[in-house]
Amino acid sequence: MSRGSIEIPLRDTDEVIELDFDQLPEGDEVISILKQEHTQLHIWIALGLEYYKQVKTEDFVKLLEAARIDGNLDYRDHEKDQMTCLDTLAAYYVQQARKEKNKDNKKELITQATLLYTMADKIIMYDQNHLLGRACFCLLEGDKMDQADAQFHFVLNQSPNNIPALLGKACISFNKKDYRGALAYYKKALRTNPGCPAGVRLGMGHCFVKLNKLDKARLAFGRALDLNPTCVGALVGLAVLELNNKEADSIKNGVQLLSKAYTIDPSNPMVLNHLANHFFFKKDYSKVQHLALHAFHNTEVEAMQAESCYQLARSFHVQEDYDQAFQYYYQATQFAAASFVLPFFGLGQMYIYRGDKENASQCFEKVLKAYPNNYETMKILGSLYAASDDQEKRDIAKSHLKKVTEQYPDDVEAWIELAQILEQTDIQNALSAYGTATRILQEKVQADVPPEILNNVGALHFRLGNLGEAKKYFLASLDRAKAEAEHDEHYYNAISVTTTYNLARLYEGLCEFHESEKLYKNILREHPNYVDCYLRLGAMARDKGNFYEASDWFKEALQINQDHPDAWSLIGNLHLAKQEWGPGQKKFERILKQPSTQNDTYSMLALGNVWLQTLHQPTRDREKEKRHQDRALAIYKQVLRNDSKNLYAANGIGAVLAHKGYVREARDVFAQVREATADISDVWLNLAHIYVEQKQYISAVQMYENCLRKFYKHQNTEVLLYLARALFKCGKLQECKQILLKARHVAPNDTVLMFNVALVLQRLATLVLKDEKSNLKAVLNAVKELELAHRYFNYLSKVGDKMRFDLALAASEARQCSDLLSQAQYHVARARKQDEEEKELRAKQEQEKEILRQKLIKEQEEKRLKEIEEQKKLLEQRAQYVEKTRNLLNFTGEMETPKEKKQRGGGGGGGGRRSKKNGEFDEFVNDDSDEDLAPRKKKRKKGGGSSGSGGEQGEGGEEGEGGEKKKKKRRKRPQKGGDGSDDDEDQAPQPKKRQPKKREKPAKFERTPPSMKGKIKSKAIISSSEDDSDEDKLKIADEGHGRGSNSDSDEGPRTQAKKRIMSDSDSDNANKSGSGAGSPQKSPQSDGDSDNNAWARKRRRQDSGSDNDSAQSRRSSGGSDNESRAASRSPESQRGSDRGSDNEGSARASPNESEQEASNNEKSDRGSDDSD
């Protein structure tokens, strides 16, 4: 069946040439016909495509290349055909470039395609087919993915269902790891055209694998195989899924699928690499190498080539062909993507084999970056960095190994590696790590602990000072090494030697030098070249003071190793200890001349210290001193350049600065060094020296004392001398003397100490002698110390150390002591005289004190006797008064009539008003009734009525208020010894107007006749206390504090006396009155009271007469008024009571005055009654 034909019009005629597709002539013949007939371009393109379909690619290329030049463009829309011609040819070149293996040819094809696409851009830039072709070309180049994405996006905006654009977007999304997006594009393309080729299903399968949807991936790969049984990609995908199941049947199926794919396409690199991987685990390394090499040469994809190289490298690695393995590992890392780190792991192992730890670390760091918690990588890196000299890397190693031990706590190797790292910085944790490793070995591995670990644990205990534990582990290590020596005698004998050396060092620490020396010599008998033993024997001899023996041992070490730096350093230190600066300097210079030790830090520091020491020697050559300063400074700087953290070099620079006079800068340097570490004693001493130079003596003293406490278990005479110097400069000579004496106990033969002691004694004695206030004992002691200082200076001026101080200075000081001693007798005499005067003065003072003391004792005794006498007298008076009061109360009780008792009982709470009708004794007045006088006074002040009516009204009002809180009238105290005038008895009181401050008082009438005066005593003067102080008086006044509101000052004692009498006769009053509150109480009087009362009643009866009725009515009305007034005045009464307390001093009146006051008050009461 004919596939068709094409007609070629003949020029200038209506005839055509028909070419059958099944019988196409040669390309050149067709091209000549087309050129001759000036055929239009679209016919050229159609013929070219037909040639391409018939796989006649050469004719296809010739035809399209000729059409670009000779095609007829004289027709409508020729631009689109022109663009199609260029795009078609460019697409062919792109396809060829994808298949080309040769890089140069591939590059040439890509260049031609780029040129054709650029020409097509100039014709029609935004044609869909043109854009699709150009986007596919950008995908092939790889680095223009974003540009291709933009072109696919542009096409999809114009035609959303364009399948090539959808597939291109899916490819781009997959490469950008947007697997869901890629799957969506594939699905859309499949929905748009369900008859898509198998490649679409293959792409979907890859997306499903990346999304971990393995079942759907399996279905997609299966569907692709259904559509195209020769789809190699689908076969490989299914094979990988089967192999990852890790089951025997699945692995077998996977290998069969790979074999089928290999049969279909033997050059497919993916198939070849997977087969190589399979045969590697089958240990068929020859097939691995053949397949991987074949795969490497059949692909230009670098990821595929990296996989092929890796397969080749590990096959050579397992065959121990490390050179070939290194070559292919390295080549694989050049091709590998960032995520493919297996070649770096193998390459790192090859670098370790070659001893290149730096490159090995870099390789494993790349692996760890991709897989941060990979156990093997962290362990290897930890081991590599553990052996590094860089502290930062050691810290990284410690971090990695800690993570390893956390992930796998039973990894013994990791614990041992971690312990070895911690040995330098954290001994305690290192011991803990070794302990864990030991426990794992014994409990889980069921193995003996290696002698190496036992030795290391012992060394750590030795460093911690646990010498007993260290000895136990060293001995255990020796026993274990002897047991293991049966298997590897040479190795374990070497371990035994090391452990024996450590044990000898331990015996040194235990001060068992004999045992230590024996072990060192035993080692030297078996191993004469063990240099460290010679050095330790020399150091022991040096510490004993045997410098010559020490030098011999060090020279023995030099015979074994002529350039041993430690031996030369120890010999140099011997010279420096003897202050042989020149020979010592030469030894350290020799070390620095050797190429291997030309930057030896210890030797350079020693040289700097030598130059610094020369600055301490007295010299007048300033140029030489400056030269030495500069040399020392240059050496210290060189050390810091080699080791920026060397604290000793920084300390040396500070010392040089101090010598140059830059004290402040030197102090800053020392302070920084001390901040970095507080374990260098020289820094503390240098800071203290700086403080002395700055005259901060207190700070210097504190620094010296702290240095002594921190660094020197025993007294260090040098530091004690520094401390004494600081104390001397700050004037604390006594403390300075004590420090120097302490140093003399340590070094009694030190002439410098002797000189300083003598100087301090001289200064102290001088101060004491010049002080005129010094006592005799101090002066005598000063003279004694001055004589001692004189002897010291005389001795030192003859046999002193010329190298340490000037002997002439000692002689000068001796002469000065002699001069002071010549003046000592004057000072002694002056002090003795002063001492005698002071003794006399003290004796006189003591005598005066004794007299004064005796006088005080006598006065105190007299006072005590007087107080006893007064107390006795008061007690007698009180007893008399109590007896008289008791008699009086008994007499008054007999005089009362039953009617009066009844009236008193009935008026207890309320009224209590009396009239003459009630009986003859209703008007009877006793001392208690003066409580009724206070309201009487109020009445007169308020209403201005007569005293008689006011008195009755006041009496009724007072009893109407009830209770014992009756207002009392204060009376003026009569003059001492006065009996009262007759006018007071006859004359009635005149009412007065009340003044703001001064009130007129009615005349007082005596109730007691003169014959009774002196017989009634007030109880106010009787006190239970031993003295009559104000406090006791105040207590007596408080008992009647609330009684008198506006009374005068003389009322206080009367009220107190009455209150006290009431308290003495409670039982009688309770029996005689009903409620006891309103009944009048008996007045304390003598036996003659009854006559006076009778006389008073008779006179009242005669005078009152007919006025009784009117008076009685007035009393009734006045009583009610007074009740209300008394109630309204209660606050005033309270204030009056406060004022009344100020008058309590009246209680001091003598008994006679109290008797007169009582009689006057009685007369006053009678007078008021008579007026009624």
Swiss-Prot record:
GO CC, alphabetical: Cdc73/Paf1 complex; euchromatin; nuclear speck
Predominant subcellular localization, coarse grouping: nucleus
Residue spans of biased composition, Polar residues class: 1068-1093, 1105-1134, 1149-1159
Sequence ranges of Basic residues compositional bias: 965-975, 991-1001
InterPro entries attached to this UniProt entry: Ctr9, TPR-like_helical_dom_sf, TPR_rpt
Sequence ranges of the TPR repeats: 41-75, 129-162, 163-196, 198-231, 235-268, 306-339, 341-374, 412-444, 451-484, 497-530, 531-564, 566-598, 613-646, 648-680, 681-714, 717-750
Single Gene Ontology BP annotation: negative regulation of transcription by RNA polymerase II
Function statement: Component of the PAF1 complex (PAF1C) which has multiple functions during transcription by RNA polymerase II. PAF1C associates with RNA polymerase II, is involved in transcriptional elongation and in histone modifications including methylation on histone H3 'Lys-4' (H3K4me3).
Protein name: RNA polymerase-associated protein CTR9 homolog
